[in-house]
Amino acid sequence: MASISLPKHSLPSLLPTLKPITSSSQNLPILSKSSQSQFYGLKFSHSTSLSIPSSSSVKNTIFAKVNKGQAPPSFTLKDQDGKTLSLSKFKGKPVVVYFYPADETPGCTKQACAFRDSYEKFKKAGAEVVGISGDDPSSHKAFAKKYRLPFTLLSDEGNKIRKEWGVPADLFGTLPGRQTYVLDKKGVVQLIYNNQFQPEKHIDETLKLLQSL
């Protein structure tokens, strides 16, 4: 029987050496862009990089800390006029608290204008509407003026309240979440609605719930 002999550099030695993935590889960059762009309602500018978070960070963003039937953590934040406002101010009436990614982005503008167009329905239901994002008060003021928003916008710079409420991020943790809460007169959460890509549906769902309270 004929035999085949391999040269000294056998097949395994011809294959590239693969380095094992270490803990330092948990966050792998998947997007880098030097110029400004927008993606699903979020602004990216000047060397913005997105990364896939580690399994532990994903777990923390998926499981919310505030659940239906609970009273959420209170807050005191500045509104678009620079005045401080606390959640306790709304005790005794229903309140819609919606977290959104950023002012002046396509999805967030649609959502804000949809709340504006239905604002009288919310007032008729006896409810207040409050929007929260990480933008500063001056950004909120310009945003509210441009689109004639009749409700309060609060500045959560550093996203402290977003984290305390456990608002989940989207797209592997790279996008701030778009989540709406409806609190009843006692300050207890009766609805949590999350929909990043259909911002107008937040209005339909919250009105439906308010009409049943």
UniProtKB/Swiss-Prot annotation:
Protein purpose: Thiol-specific peroxidase that catalyzes the reduction of hydrogen peroxide and organic hydroperoxides to water and alcohols, respectively. Plays a role in cell protection against oxidative stress by detoxifying peroxides. Involved in the plant defense against pathogen.
Gene encoding the protein: PRXQ
Further remarks about this protein from its record: The active site is a conserved redox-active cysteine residue, the peroxidatic cysteine (C(P)), which makes the nucleophilic attack on the peroxide substrate. The peroxide oxidizes the C(P)-SH to cysteine sulfenic acid (C(P)-SOH), which then reacts with another cysteine residue, the resolving cysteine (C(R)), to form a disulfide bridge. The disulfide is subsequently reduced by an appropriate electron donor to complete the catalytic cycle. In this atypical 2-Cys peroxiredoxin, C(R) is present in the same subunit to form an intramolecular disulfide.
Family that this chain belongs to: Belongs to the peroxiredoxin family. BCP/PrxQ subfamily.
One Pfam family this sequence matches: AhpC-TSA
One Gene Ontology cellular component annotation held by this UniProt entry: chloroplast thylakoid membrane
All residue ranges annotated as the Thioredoxin domain in the record: 66-213
Organelle targeting peptide span: 1-54
Disulfide bonding pattern of the chain: 108-113
List of catalytic residues: 108 (cysteine sulfenic acid (-soh) intermediate)
EC number: 1.11.1.24
Main location (coarse class): plastid
Subunit structure: Monomer.
Cited SUPFAM superfamilies: Thioredoxin-like
GO terms of molecular function: thioredoxin peroxidase activity
Name used for this protein in its record: Peroxiredoxin Q, chloroplastic
One of the protein's GO biological processes: cell redox homeostasis
Organism: Populus jackii
UniProt-annotated location(s): Plastid, Chloroplast thylakoid lumen
Catalytic activity: a hydroperoxide + [thioredoxin]-dithiol = an alcohol + [thioredoxin]-disulfide + H2O
InterPro entries xrefs: AhpC/TSA, Peroxiredoxin_BCP/PrxQ, Thioredoxin-like_sf, Thioredoxin_domain
CDD domains per the UniProt record, alphabetical: PRX_BCP (cd03017)
Top-level taxon in the UniProt lineage: Eukaryota
Induction: By pathogen attack.
Keyword entries, A-Z: Antioxidant, Chloroplast, Disulfide bond, Oxidoreductase, Peroxidase, Plastid, Redox-active center, Thylakoid, Transit peptide
